[in-house]
């Protein structure tokens, strides 16, 4: 079982840790073609699309859980139908985004309220990026399906190749074709469509044998569609809670001062790095728990829960020790601003608590995605999010920015605790 978990987790971790590279390259490119407004436009535009795509991450999660269960039942016709269903819905939503682009981009930029010189550049960036929406959401369906099929290597290969294509295309368009923010955006769009095309090709290469199973009937029957949308509705609402907490965390820091915002952003990077590793084991939990749950093998299912929790504890302890030992030296790798590093000392130990407090939330999220218990996931996240806001507003007058960190640490802990209680009472 340990080997199966690592076989699924490691490729996902490799994919995750390459994600920041793209943002760094985009910023580096525009940093050489204009002033700070270009960098601001890329930051605003990419944040807008990141939030939108994050909200529709249910396409990956819902597909992963249902596919792994169908695989466990050895219902290969349904496995095929799930892919067609997810791809159709993902690409369809992407086309709706394209049709509504003026309204979406206008509202998004209004809500983010960047300075006037940034707004026009960000709008130009977004109007190019929107062409990639069908590819991004279609690839979400493919990625979830591959994970459900116990294959995280194909998503890793697609992700790494996308990154390379994005970098090369952006460099060529900006420095050879003399495009500016549109060049960076078009490089991203080219990479997104390349990723979808590559997923289609790899599917044909590795899963051609599934063509012998008849899947063309009942693809869009009302009952499976109702289940698909019911599951994804709960995951969507859960994601809204996650986005609300994360956006509020940033906004609350900015209201304190620019220095506190910088400190919070720096320390949240420690959480982000930890999450790249834990997401890998969450994906493994999705795939394996769904497969054994679908097969009705409760012994193997409980073993998956036990083993992924053990790996989670190991990763959490490892990162906690790394942060304690590294301390200020670790922060100096992320910034050279001595003022920010010094100010971080007052809040550093809150960030150290994040791995141990957040570990169980990652693992149980993966398990509950795999067994498609979306209502339980929504319940845990809603309770934790409500607690986050209540704690912050009650304690902020007394503790200041410490209240924000205390609320966030307890929010992570509570998500895992609620899911653990549900698992013990209903699933064990």
Specify the residue positions occupied by each region the protein language model found.
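Small-residue-rich hydrophobic transmembrane alpha-helices
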Residues: 39-99, 136-155, 263-325, 359-372, ...
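Short runs within selected transmembrane alpha-helices of multi-pass transporters and secretion channels
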Residues: 60, 128-148, 155-166, 184-200, ...
């Amino acid at each position: 079982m340990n080997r199966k978990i690592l076989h699924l987790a490691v490729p996902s971790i490799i994919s995750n840790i390459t994600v920041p590279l793209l943002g760094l390259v985009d910023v580096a490119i525009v940093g050489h073609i204009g002033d700070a407004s270009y960098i601001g436009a890329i930051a605003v535009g990419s944040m807008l699309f990141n939030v939108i795509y994050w909200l529709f991450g249910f396409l990956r999660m819902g597909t992963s859980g249902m596919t792994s269960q169908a695989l466990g039942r050895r219902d290969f016709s349904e496995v095929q139908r799930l892919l067609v269903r997810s791809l159709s819905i993902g690409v369809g939503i992407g086309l709706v985004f394209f049709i509504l682009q003026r309204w979406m981009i206008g509202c998004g930029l209004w809500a983010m309220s960047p300075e006037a010189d940034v707004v026009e550049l960000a709008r130009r960036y977004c109007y190019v990026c929107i062409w990639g929406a069908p590819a991004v959401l279609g690839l979400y369906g493919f990625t979830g399906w591959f994970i459900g099929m116990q294959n995280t290597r194909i998503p890793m290969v697609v992700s790494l190749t996308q990154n390379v294509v994005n970098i090369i295309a952006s460099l060529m368009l900006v420095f050879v074709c003399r495009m500016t923010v549109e060049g960076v955006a078009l490089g991203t769009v080219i990479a997104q469509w390349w990723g979808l095309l590559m997923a289609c090709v790899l599917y044909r290469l590795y899963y051609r044998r599934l063509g012998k199973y008849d899947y063309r009937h009942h693809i869009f029957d009302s009952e499976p569609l109702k289940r698909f949308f019911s599951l994804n509705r709960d995951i969507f609402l859960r994601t809204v809670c996650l986005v609300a907490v994360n956006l509020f965390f940033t906004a609350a820091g900015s209201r304190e001062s620019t220095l506190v915002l910088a400190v919070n952003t720096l320390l949240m990077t420690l959480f982000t790095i930890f999450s790249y590793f834990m997401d890998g084991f969450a994906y493994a939990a999705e795939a394996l728990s769904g497969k054994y749950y679908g097969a009705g093998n409760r012994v193997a299912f409980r073993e998956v829960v036990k083993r992924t929790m053990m790996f989670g504890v190991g990763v959490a302890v490892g990162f906690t020790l790394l942060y304690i030992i590294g301390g200020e030296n670790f922060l100096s790798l992320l910034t050279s601003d001595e003022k920010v590093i010094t100010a971080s000392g007052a809040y550093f130990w809150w960030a150290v608590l994040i791995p141990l407090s957040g570990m169980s939330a990652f693992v149980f999220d993966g398990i509950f995605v795999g067994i498609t218990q979306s209502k339980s996931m929504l319940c845990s996240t809603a309770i934790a999010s409500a607690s986050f806001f209540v704690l912050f507003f009650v304690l902020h007058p007394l503790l200041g920015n410490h209240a924000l960190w205390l609320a966030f640490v307890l929010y992570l802990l509570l998500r895992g605790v609620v899911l653990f209680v549900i698992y013990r009472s209903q699933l064990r």
